[in-house]
């Protein structure tokens, strides 16, 4: 008897995403699982069991990227014991998929049973946060409501309504893994271990879900958090907010939230390392008279003494007026003041007076 199309068994299109396949599988399991049909007649139970096995087989293939590609290319023949005895059939085949299948099933990197049975930390999340240039130099505290995932306190992370609603998975006998034989063109029969298609690696079946988390084992809450941005932080750096990532597995801790700092550009200031640069227009009169001028900085005005030998474009250092090092606040950069000379406006009479003065000056720069 010819096997039915796996996509039709699950009631999904051939282009269905993995999320759609998982959703369809869970809906069908909820209908045809043996534990859901105990009150029906013997014949109906037998039909439900046969249907359930079809659903398992279809899900086992379509939920695995490698097997799904093989099925889409070769159909049921990819898993037939008589297929692949020869050395042909490599055209268009992805060897990367083959070897990823090997490494996932042959224990490279550790036991798969251990992987699914031990507590694992949740996935780390990443987000961006935008601050001004001045805030990056001075530091800032931000209060924000963040999503947090905690273990359900009603079921203690089991997902079941009570302990009596948890049974050992009949398909994998509690191991979380199942063994299968693949017939890969050019390789012959290959034994492989995959995640159990019934319990999805947990080793247990739940007959009644927890009323609070509905079997998800975790609950989602909102928590007000104060995020401290250290003084001197630079664009592209990260701040870690512990415990605000994805939910842990098997009672493991939640992952972390990594905030990428994005510093907006400033109209006047730029930064290089811990040094801050600023262009400062100064009157040539202040330079000639060697006056002291006030220069803006992120922490306020700084006084700079001008000297008559300065030239336009000269860089004047104001020590420790730059940015603090976020890892060591005792290290502080300098303020680099780029002098830009300008000539003030003069009245015609003032120009005449200046010309008389200039006529008496021996301009040595003309010889250069």
Curated annotation (Swiss-Prot):
Entry superkingdom: Bacteria
Cofactor note: Binds 2 Zn(2+) ions per monomer.
Residue sites binding Zn(2+) 1 per the record: 152, 155, 210, 213
Mapped CXXCXGXG motif repeat ranges: 152-159, 169-176, 196-203, 210-217
InterPro entries named in the record: DnaJ (IPR012724), DnaJ_C (IPR002939), DnaJ_domain (IPR001623), DnaJ_domain_CS (IPR018253), HSP40/DnaJ_pept-bd (IPR008971), HSP_DnaJ_Cys-rich_dom (IPR001305), HSP_DnaJ_Cys-rich_dom_sf (IPR036410), J_dom_sf (IPR036869)
Main location: cytoplasm
Cofactor: Zn(2+)
Gene3D superfamilies cross-referenced by the UniProt entry: DnaJ domain, Heat shock protein DnaJ, cysteine-rich domain, Urease metallochaperone UreE, N-terminal domain
Zinc fingers (CR-type) by residue: 139-222
Residues bound to Zn(2+) 2: 169, 172, 196, 199
GO molecular function: ATP binding; heat shock protein binding; unfolded protein binding; zinc ion binding
Localization (cell): Cytoplasm
Pfam families registered for this protein in UniProt: DnaJ, DnaJ_C, DnaJ_CXXCXGXG
Residues covered by the J domain: 5-75
GO biological process: chaperone cofactor-dependent protein refolding; DNA replication; protein refolding; response to heat
Keywords: Chaperone, Cytoplasm, DNA replication, Metal-binding, Repeat, Stress response, Zinc, Zinc-finger
One Gene Ontology cellular component annotation held by this UniProt entry: cytoplasm
Entry-linked CDD domains: DnaJ, DnaJ_C, DnaJ_zf
Stretches that traverse the bilayer: none
Subunit structure: Homodimer.
Function text: Participates actively in the response to hyperosmotic and heat shock by preventing the aggregation of stress-denatured proteins and by disaggregating proteins, also in an autonomous, DnaK-independent fashion. Unfolded proteins bind initially to DnaJ; upon interaction with the DnaJ-bound protein, DnaK hydrolyzes its bound ATP, resulting in the formation of a stable complex. GrpE releases ADP from DnaK; ATP binding to DnaK triggers the release of the substrate protein, thus completing the reaction cycle.
Domain remark from Swiss-Prot or TrEMBL: The J domain is necessary and sufficient to stimulate DnaK ATPase activity. Zinc center 1 plays an important role in the autonomous, DnaK-independent chaperone activity of DnaJ. Zinc center 2 is essential for interaction with DnaK and for DnaJ activity.
UniProt similarity note: Belongs to the DnaJ family.
Name of this chain's protein: Chaperone protein DnaJ
Source organism (scientific name): Mesomycoplasma hyopneumoniae (strain 232)
Lineage summary: Bacteria, Bacillati, Mycoplasmatota, Mycoplasmoidales, Metamycoplasmataceae
């Amino acid at each position: 008897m010819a096997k039915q199309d796996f996509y039709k068994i699950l009631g999904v299109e051939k282009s269905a995403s993995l999320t759609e396949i998982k959703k369809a599988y869970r809906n069908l399991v909820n209908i045809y699982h043996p534990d859901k049909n105990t009150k029906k007649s013997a014949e109906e139970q037998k039909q439900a069991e046969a249907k359930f096995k079809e659903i398992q087989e279809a899900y086992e293939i379509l939920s695995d990227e490698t097997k799904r590609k093989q099925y889409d290319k070769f159909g049921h023949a990819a898993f037939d014991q008589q297929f692949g005895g020869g050395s042909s059939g490599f055209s268009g085949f992805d060897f990367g998929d083959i070897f990823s299948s090997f490494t996932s099933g042959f224990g490279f990197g550790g036991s798969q049973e251990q992987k699914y049975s031990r507590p694992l930390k949740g996935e780390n999340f990443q987000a961006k946060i935008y601050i001004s240039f001045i805030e990056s130099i001075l530091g800032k505290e931000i209060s924000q409501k963040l999503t947090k995932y905690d273990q359900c306190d009603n079921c203690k992370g089991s997902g079941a309504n009570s302990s009596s609603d948890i049974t050992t998975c009949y398909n994998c006998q509690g191991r979380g893994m199942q063994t299968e034989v693949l017939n890969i063109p050019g390789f012959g029969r290959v034994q492989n271990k995959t995640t159990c298609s019934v319990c999805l690696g947990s080793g247990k079946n739940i007959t009644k879900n927890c009323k609070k988390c509905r079997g998800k084992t975790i609950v989602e809450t909102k928590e007000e958090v104060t995020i401290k941005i250290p003084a001197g932080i630079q664009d592209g750096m990260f701040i870690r907010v512990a415990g605000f990532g994805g939910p842990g597995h098997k009672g493991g801790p939640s992952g972390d939230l990594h905030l990428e700092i994005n510093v907006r550009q400033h109209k006047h200031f730029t930064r290089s390392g811990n040094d801050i640069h600023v262009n400062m227009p100064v009157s040539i009169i202040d330079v000639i008279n060697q006056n002291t001028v006030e220069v803006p900085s992120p922490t306020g005005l700084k006084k700079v003494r001008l000297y008559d030998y300065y030239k336009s474009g000269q860089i004047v250092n104001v020590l420790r007026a730059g940015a603090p090092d976020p890892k060591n606040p005792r290290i502080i950069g300098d303020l680099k003041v780029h002098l830009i000379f300008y000539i003030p406006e003069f009245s015609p009479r003032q120009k005449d007076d200046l010309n008389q003065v200039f006529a008496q000056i021996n301009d040595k720069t003309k010889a250069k």
